[in-house]
Amino acid sequence: SLSINTNTSEMIALQTLDA
């Protein structure tokens, strides 16, 4: 969450859990 790349990874992880 400290960088844009990390934030993007977190978003992908949330989408994976939601899917």
UniProtKB/Swiss-Prot annotation:
Question: GO terms for CC?
Answer: extracellular region
Q: What is its main location?
A: secreted
Keyword set, alphabetical order = Secreted
- Where, subcellularly, is it found? Secreted
Record protein name field = Flagellin-like protein
Q: Which organism is it from?
A: Gluconacetobacter diazotrophicus
